Amino acid sequence: MILRSSIAETSEPLPVSAAVLQRSLLNWYDRHGRDLPWRKPPDVLDPYRVWVSEIALQQTQVKTVLPYYQRWFDRFPTIADLARADLQAVLKAWEGLGYYSRARNLHRAAQLVMERHGGQFPRTLAEAIALPGIGRTTAGGILSSAFNLPLPILDGNVKRVLARLIALPVAPAKALDRLWAASEAVVSLDRPRDLNQALMDLGATVCTARKPACLVCPWMAYCQAYQTNQQQQIPVSEPKAPIPHKVIGVAVIRNPQGQILIDRRPAEGLLGGLWEFPGGKVEPNESISDCIRREIQEELGIEIAVGEELIVVDHAYTHFKVSLHVHLCEHLQGEPQAIACDEVRWVTLAEIDQFPFPKANTTIIEALKQRFPDA
């Protein structure tokens, strides 16, 4: 299907005046905006709270973030508290939200805010973007919400709304300049905080990816995708490559005292700084048991006996999927060495909840607690 756009690339970025779009959207928002804690005083006036909410909402749904929000500030009430916290405590507080680089960046950025800005979140776009984990749209979201500055945003919801509004004939990733121009044109000088939040709410509740509720949309009369009956085809999606699937052998290694061996991943990279049960990828024509023995010898320098299967955990990351085949194992000989990790520890099952683990590993922990209820 050839998509049609009624707006030439060289013309105005919006199909009607910004004032018309602002008025209709803000009227809708005043009646239907979502009731979220980071939008209410005093939180909405606190850039630290807005900042944490913006980071947590990256690639994570609101309903998932809500239970974490107040717990985070109970643990780290101020930027100074976060900056001086141990990274392991920060990762533990983030446990379950995923995309742990966000927590590491929050921690490092808090330290930089203390060092460079006297503990006050910066008020300029350039200074905000200079902090780890903050790009243009996150900075715009923080500064427009906390300080009511007229800055555009372009998260996933807003891209979809604007792509439909202007009937964007190509995938959003191929026309970011046009979408930024549209977002900048539509932002309100009088109510930028509310306008940006209204855009996000419109995408989250009305202009959804599937089955958009066009008949109740405040922009229905101006939406070029709706007017040309293309709302189901826009935004244009690009073909996705097949997602690789990895089979992983995982060892829950126990010593005669009933302790369990865990290791901490390197600080950089996927799941950096988190603890896990050791193991690795199954090679072609290799059994799960042989994989586990080989990986433990290579990574920790010890010999083990591979026992019964405890659980199989299927988990999806952004760019690949894994199946973790978890076996109970017995430590035979050798002192564990941190060869391919940053640290190793023997811990009891009662102590294990003190350490931050990836979500897939927390499933293993629950299986262990059921298997050894008296440990």
Language-model regions, residue ranges each:
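N-terminal strand-loop-strand
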Residues: Q230-E276, A305
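The catalytic Nudix box helix
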Residues: F277-I311, T348
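Acidic pyrophosphate-coordinating catalytic loop
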Residues: K240-P244, E268, V313-L324
